Amino acid sequence: MKNQKSTLLLIIYCLSTCIVTAQQHVETIKNTFLNPKSNKVLVVAHRGNWRSAPENSTAAIDSAIAMKVDIVEIDIQKTKDGQLILMHDNTLDRTTTGKGEIKNWTLADIKKLKLKDKDGKVTNYVVPTLEESLLTAKGKIMVNLDKAYDIFDDVYAILEKTETQNQVIMKGGQPIETVKREFGSYLDKVLYMPVIDLGNK
């Protein structure tokens, strides 16, 4: 009995240590991101590591984490029934076994589809929700949200639910006055990164 208690305490200690270490890792990345004097180059995995798993999948996020990437960029779309999923395109055609616009599909129906890899081959992976993806990344990697600006009220509710506000980077290409007007209530809660188009002069 005494040995069992000791083992249980050891397991609890190890788990708590892992959680603290993971949180510290994210804070280190965040501090580097915010430090204008830092000479460290932060690595971003665009749509996750899509070379080893389908883009915008939890497997692609896991792979980026395993590679010790600093930030994973993911794209968000909204389903017919108002659920948030990971998908770059407005349609399902290119990256899944389905066809048509995402806005015409419910989450339940999308979950029946399979994701395709970079070569268009069908895999066993399914389309993840934003919540599933944030829980995969939680405490392990910073998350850059794309295509989230216009639906950020919905996005933020999930950030609160998953307690991942501290590791998310929101972005947009709008003028600063527009951002303050439309996004102002969130500017002290999440990081905001303006997209600068060097082609526009």
Language model segments and positions:
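Bacterial Sec-dependent N-terminal signal peptides
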Residues: 1-26
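Phosphate-group recognition and catalysis centered on beta-loop-alpha active-site segments
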Residues: 23-201
